[in-house]
């Protein structure tokens, strides 16, 4: 019996070593192996290489570099034009909107337009996303015009990279560039939800709220992870293919930043046994008040979340610094 148990234990160790070796091999191949994605990549660049001109309101033209940022007043339309080459035969143009309404014209014909004015429930601007304009070889030699309009100074005058090629190839390039961060966000979201459920289950099983004598509370840590992952998904460049309503996810991104100090305060209060509870409670009231005021301004279309975001960022930084100081004091005290 002892020999059988020893052999089974040896098998377990072999399994652990084997799995670590397989994981190591996989990581080695990804870091140092051949990049097989290149075999499917287009042979030519999908970045549009033609010249763009900014047609200003005073009638003058200025050749501009793309991507770039230029001085345009909020609410004013920035008009960009380029002449398609004589041998043009691509099927799509694309540009990323940064909280901008976008219109594509080929010749004098409106080919594509994007605006959430009639579909969004609140806010002043359209959510950022990639806009595709279909083209054909018949458009060779014609003038392509792009009109950009935003109603906030944060993104007024911003011109993002312009892509030209097959729509699938453009999406592949975008996915290869930004896909990994989206996968990481989903992983953190799954881990955060698991932590919340695990923390709630522990409280239910042991009939305690973990308020005394516990250094780690799974639930609040899970909420921090969930809110962080939702922020990452809201910032994802490919969010328009993740959800049907990208505007809601974009707004949720800012909401998470505004409310994220709360679970951090709850966690810090728990591990310090309520030592600074009154202070944390007052800070929590300020966080909630900022959320309510910002939401009212957003719903009434007075200011977008992006315009009130600096206040939330300052609160978050203040909470981080305060909690860090208190935790250092707490750790120093318990180590004495």
Report the location of each language-model feature.
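Extended low-complexity, serine/threonine- and proline-enriched intrinsically disordered segments
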Residues: 43-56, 100-110, 162
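Extended carbohydrate-recognition surfaces in non-catalytic/accessory domains of CAZymes
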Residues: 3-86
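Aromatic-lined ligand-binding clefts that engage carbohydrates, nucleic acids, or primary amines
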Residues: 86-106, 144-146
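Intrinsic-disorder/low-complexity, polar/charged segments enriched in Ser/Thr/Lys/Arg/Asp/Glu/Gln
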Residues: 75-83, 90-92, 130-132, 141-143
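An acidic-aromatic loop/edge-strand motif
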Residues: 126-185
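Surface-exposed coil/turn segments at beta-strand junctions on protein surfaces, enriched
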Residues: 73, 86-88, 124-126, 137-139
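Juxtamembrane segments at transmembrane-helix boundaries
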Residues: 182-336
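Solvent-exposed beta-strand/loop surfaces of large extracellular or lumenal domains
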Residues: 60-67, 110-129
């Amino acid at each position: 019996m002892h020999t059988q148990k020893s052999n089974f234990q040896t098998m377990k160790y072999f399994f652990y070593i084997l799995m670590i070796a397989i994981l190591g091999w996989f990581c080695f191949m990804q870091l140092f192996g051949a990049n097989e994605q290149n075999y499917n990549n287009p042979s030519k660049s999908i970045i549009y290489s033609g010249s763009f001109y900014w047609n200003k309101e005073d009638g003058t033209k200025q050749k501009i570099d793309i991507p770039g940022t230029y001085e345009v007043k909020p609410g004013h339309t920035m008009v960009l034009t380029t002449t398609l080459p004589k041998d043009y035969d691509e099927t799509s143009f694309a540009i990323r909107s940064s909280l901008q309404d976008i219109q594509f014209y080929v010749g004098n014909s409106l080919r594509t337009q994007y605006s959430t004015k009639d579909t969004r429930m609140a806010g002043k601007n359209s959510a950022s996303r990639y806009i595709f304009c279909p083209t054909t070889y018949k458009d060779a030699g014609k003038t392509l015009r792009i009109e950009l309009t935003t109603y906030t100074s944060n993104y007024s005058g911003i011109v993002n990279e312009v892509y030209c090629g097959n729509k699938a190839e453009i999406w592949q390039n975008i996915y290869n560039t930004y896909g990994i961060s989206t996968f990481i966000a989903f992983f953190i979201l799954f881990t955060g939800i698991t932590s919340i459920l695990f923390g709630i289950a522990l409280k239910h099983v042991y009939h305690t709220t973990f308020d005394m004598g516990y250094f780690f509370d799974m639930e609040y840590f899970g909420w921090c992870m969930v809110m962080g992952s939702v922020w990452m998904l809201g910032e994802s460049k490919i969010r328009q293919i993740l959800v049907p309503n990208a505007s809601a996810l974009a707004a949720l991104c800012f909401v998470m930043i505004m409310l994220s100090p709360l679970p951090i305060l709850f966690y810090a209060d728990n591990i310090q046994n309520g030592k600074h509870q009154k202070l944390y409670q007052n800070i929590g009231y300020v966080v909630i008040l900022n959320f309510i005021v910002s939401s009212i301004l957003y719903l009434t279309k007075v200011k977008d979340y992006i315009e009130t975001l600096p206040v939330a960022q300052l609160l978050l930084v203040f909470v981080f610094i305060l909690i860090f100081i208190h935790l250092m004091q707490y750790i120093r005290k318990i180590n004495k």
